[in-house]
Curated annotation (Swiss-Prot):
Gene3D superfamilies: alpha/beta hydrolase. Residues 32-70 are annotated as: Disordered. This is Protein phosphatase methylesterase 1. GO terms for molecular function: protein C-terminal methylesterase activity. The keyword tRNA processing does not apply. Belongs to the AB hydrolase superfamily.
Amino acid sequence: MSDDLRRKIALSQFERAKNVLDATFQEAYEDDENDGDALGSLPSFNGQSNRNRKYTGKTGSTTDRISSKEKSSLPTWSDFFDNKELVSLPDRDLDVNTYYTLPTSLLSNTTSIPIFIFHHGAGSSGLSFANLAKELNTKLEGRCGCFAFDARGHAETKFKKADAPICFDRDSFIKDFVSLLNYWFKSKISQEPLQKVSVILIGHSLGGSICTFAYPKLSTELQKKILGITMLDIVEEAAIMALNKVEHFLQNTPNVFESINDAVDWHVQHALSRLRSSAEIAIPALFAPLKSGKVVRITNLKTFSPFWDTWFTDLSHSFVGLPVSKLLILAGNENLDKELIVGQMQGKYQLVVFQDSGHFIQEDSPIKTAITLIDFWKRNDSRNVVIKTNWGQHKTVQNT
């Protein structure tokens, strides 16, 4: 092969590579400009790979800082929910901070109203689901209900007796959740026509475990209203292994920031929140102000460490065996454990993977999560299917 021919081939290959790189960087630039979660196809989303922003790694210094105007106008709970209520649960010695939006309109051609009830994971809060709740309400045009709350030891939920022994094992969280569900059902949900209510429990991480194990403890009346249970980014085997790394994570996670905006910036910098619009409502709920003007993290996960080994035990087996419809949404390439693999092969639950989301699926991909939940509700609720028949409407033509 002549040198001239080799040179032409090399130049041609270089030009093709340059075009690919240019297109890739342009796509990444447009993605960052949009700063949202692009839609993929159901039931599995295999869109663009994770987008990594460039950060300096220093608190408060990032190429994605919010402006002074934005800092003075962070969103509040009322931008996402219609109501905020402090619910007293004397049997649990708790005053639980709750957020909810009730159905505002009904469909004439359906007999089902979906009620989405959310349970957050450890170290989070009910406002982790704020963007998701808003998307659900928007897409269903007010024809749904959304309930979220702060679990014990989190955000604005308080113990009635500050000096009482505090337990953070799974069973305690479950009893809280069951008590709160009973309150919601009697005071809010049952006000809707009962034949129309289809309740879907959605739990992120630890919340998924709590939803799974709470179901058998619900009253028979309430169990009949549970259409399905959804777990967000939780696999028993992986979760138990991850607990061994929590100490290292906590050592590298600041508990005090100069301001709430610095806290938001830090979580976005470190990709703990990949969608700023979600971070701006979810992160402030995790901090309380100090007299110095700084903010401190409300939940100290180190105090939970004696109870970690109770959180995920037997989760996969119990989830697969639930007698209701089940949905598991995972982020990235999370591997299934044996129980989930067998259950998936047997068609025991629906599996959806968001390749471009971080661990906080409801925050990083609220649009796709909303679409997936709506699809899950529609495909599993037989009351949404109206079968019309012409049986008996046609006269029989007899031969003459």
